Amino acid sequence: MASTNFRPLHDRVVVRRVESEEKTKGGIIIPDTAKEKPQEGEIVAVGSGARDESGKVVPLDVKAGDRILFGKWSGTEVKINGEDLLIMKEADIMGVIG
């Protein structure tokens, strides 16, 4: 996993999408224009956490290296060090795989 020098703030995470399959199980090659963006990714970096009502920082439940599922429209696409990544809030994450 390549490290990034970008540190998200608060309850945000930086996610690298997992590459989708180039072929179907039947062997049909899927062109880039027909591929759906995967809704699965690996967390690259995490923020320090959100603050609760008393001002205490609540750490995130996820960590760098976790493989996650997220919503189709979750996050903001950014390019960091030439790599396409997503920045999203922890609340946009549906769950951790594995």
Swiss-Prot record:
Q: Which InterPro entries match?
A: Chaperonin_GroES, Chaperonin_GroES_sf, Chaprnonin_Cpn10_CS, GroES-like_sf
Induction annotation? By heat shock.
Domain of life here? Answer: Bacteria
Q: Name one GO molecular function term.
A: ATP binding
* Cellular location(s): Cytoplasm
Gene Ontology terms describing biological process: chaperone cofactor-dependent protein refolding
Any one Gene Ontology cellular component term annotated for this protein? cytoplasm
Keywords associated with the record:
Chaperone, Cytoplasm, Stress response
**SUPFAM superfamilies in the record, alphabetically?**
GroES-like
Cross-referenced Pfam families: Cpn10
Looking up PROSITE patterns in the UniProt record yields: CHAPERONINS_CPN10
Q: Which family does it belong to?
A: Belongs to the GroES chaperonin family.
| Primary role | Together with the chaperonin GroEL, plays an essential role in assisting protein folding. The GroEL-GroES system forms a nano-cage that allows encapsulation of the non-native substrate proteins and provides a physical environment optimized to promote and accelerate protein folding. GroES binds to the apical surface of the GroEL ring, thereby capping the opening of the GroEL channel.
* Record text on subunit structure and interactions: Heptamer of 7 subunits arranged in a ring. Interacts with the chaperonin GroEL.
NCBIfam families, sorted: PRK00364.1-2, PRK00364.1-5, PRK00364.2-2, PRK00364.2-4, PRK00364.2-5
List the protein's name. Answer: Co-chaperonin GroES 1
Q: Which organism is it from?
A: Rhizobium meliloti (strain 1021)
